[in-house]
């Protein structure tokens, strides 16, 4: 699944994101809307990840979807 597909199916996928990253609130997940850059930024903010680590986490999650 590519990022365009993630965005298009975000309502179905945000539950998986919530399971993976439990610190995200439902409102934060709604705002992310499946956008990679938004997700990476939120991972950096909530989990204190470096940008490259957050990008890697986002990609691994996308590939598992």
In which residue ranges do the predicted regions lie?
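Intrinsically disordered, low-complexity, hydrophilic segments
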Residues: 1-65
């Amino acid at each position: 699944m590519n990022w365009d597909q993630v965005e298009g199916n975000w309502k179905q996928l945000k539950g998986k994101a919530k399971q993976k990253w439990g610190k995200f609130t439902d409102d934060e997940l709604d705002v992310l809307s499946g956008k990679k850059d938004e997700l990476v930024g939120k991972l950096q903010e909530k989990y204190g990840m470096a940008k490259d680590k957050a990008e890697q986490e986002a990609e691994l999650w996308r590939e598992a979807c």
